[in-house]
């Protein structure tokens, strides 16, 4: 104990009497054996009692809790109480030694702050318990036992006593020790209550087990020597281990088969730490090799564990071998039913279910702790396994055995029930599966019949479509013939007519329409888009007044989507109207050709009308009365009024009118167009998505193609048809303009969305296009007919690719398309439009400022491309070749997404297109050839796709 270690005490000082506690149990027992020196017993006893009370407290506290805080807090209390106890126990006789005792106590309290406090505390709380419970005569024995216990604890647990045990034992005479014990007895007899209070310390603390269960768990407690002798009066309350009785930790519920007889019969072997006979047994007994209470306990546990592991292994093997092991494993382990039957043991059930599943060896080994082992044994003691019980061959250690047997029976019953249920379930499952299989077979038969019918219908439809396509193609050809005269650029268009690519240039518009006619054919089977139907009507209407055509087309496209309505009208004007969705493109192409002005006004209005209106307004800044986006398309169709033309000019076309001047044919066209172009512009301005087309349209009214290509950009839907119509602008516009492409591919609504989504971008792009058109239109106006469309096509590709990346949603489809278009168109553009490309380069920056942030992003792309004239030229040159593939892709991906993606691009591309028109008709032939090839390829691809889609549609 700390007491012995206190610096003030010399081995021989009166405090030495306290040391016996520090001494080993053997020494204490030896001394206790003889009652020889009674002289000074009172003093020694008093001191010893003080020390015992302190020592017991510390020992207990070590066992229970070495909480320094509690001890320190109670320090003063402990000192006072110890002093009181000492005084009372000493009585008047011990007064001379009180000073020493007090000093010793002060030292002890300082040294034993932790230990003494709990002792004193519990003394106060339980002072009376000892007297009531223990008779006076046994009390001395108990006290001695306690003292020895304290010593034993100190020896076992602390090891502090070890140095003291032998050395101090030698120092102290046996007589002193004996006198200590005699004094103890005397004092107990004299002052039983008080001394008992001191003793009660230990006992109450033992009862205090409840207070400090955690510490007791953690620290092994010394075995109770008195229990080993059979003398322990504390019974279950004893704070030392009674091997079979209270050594189970907190779980006294689980009774262990104790290595030691519960009655206090002689221990299996001499207790290692506690001498067999504290009263006078030979020291040799104490020294005898200990059968430690816990080691025997451990051995018993080990035995039990080993047995349990074996049983578990067997059980697991059997379970694994059972055919329905998996089912049982999942269904039988812990069913809801089982829990209902045995709710008390729910936890155990869970354990049972878990343990068998896991590797048992690993599971059981971790629980060397008796508590866990017991629990686990208990868990798998119950019939965890369906086919066998886990039982010990050993005598049942549990008192709960009968209950467990009942539980097992219940579990077995439950398992049987579960098995029956499982069998029923399996039967039901099989029946259901059979029924399902039959149903599947029936469904397959039905599907086969339906497929056969569908095939037959498809064949019939294909035949009908072919007839329709032929009619449409004829109509288109007729319409193409008309658009040529319409456009002041007829020569170029006529030159291009043989080549659908040529249609891209203003003169080529007719060819573009022819080009679109094949597209129409491919799409005509897919009237679902509504494009195929409207195109034929659009052609007829083209033949009729442009306004009527635009109106009809606009109505059709509007049916598809508000944005398309405008584009549809413009398409109807140009052959490209073959696709109502493309009509915006074709209308632009038409506008390039004689019908160009008309289609322009309408086309711009429709494509812009849907979504672009918000962006348009920025474009409208020039005072164009922009019709509301929804109304813009129709209004533009209705009001291709010349008044809008001026606004258009003012808007994007402020520059456009100037470009108009450069080319007389352009000017004438522009003059023709102004009525329509203004509406178009207006519509474009009115509708955000249309705005792109309106920009290019208004700016290059003369170069109306480029503008319309911009609008076509807004009406990306028409892009595929326009691309097929070979208006280069239309092609790229289709790619660029979400509306046209969307309408061609998907119903107007998708286009409208895309137009709206991209209208902002398109507006920026279109503004740029307008600027470009204004810059490029002068050259374009010079050669609007022949070069206009082809140039626009290449230009559109250029713009389209920049726009494509921005149009993230559809970028994948359109980017590809645009890229192809860019190459072909850019090549053409370079050849024709290097000057116009340069012009464009300057415009894009201006356009960029005008463009909204979305526009800005597109402008950056377009601007970057425009900024580098060479790339634009390259695009212009390449745009033709790529244009066809782009058109194909557009058609292939008719979804409005791709069209909307392209939307931003078309405006940009259209500007290069304008430049390309400018570059001259010289390159138009080569471009036409390239474009024709591309368009044919695109047509083929589109036809294939349509062939696939029509069946789907």
From Swiss-Prot:
SMART domains: ZnF_C3H1 (SM00356). Residues 15-26, 60-72, 97-106, 125-136, 143-158, 191-207 have a biased composition (Acidic residues). The modification N6-acetyllysine is found at residue 814. SUPFAM superfamilies: CCCH zinc finger. Residues 1-14, 107-124, 159-168, 175-190, 208-217, 396-482, 510-520, 661-670, 760-774, 824-841 have a biased composition (Basic and acidic residues). Residues 916-925 have a biased composition (Polar residues). Interacts with ZFC3H1 in a RNase-insensitive manner. This is Zinc finger CCCH domain-containing protein 18. It comes from Homo sapiens. The lineage of its organism: Eukaryota, Metazoa, Chordata, Craniata, Vertebrata.
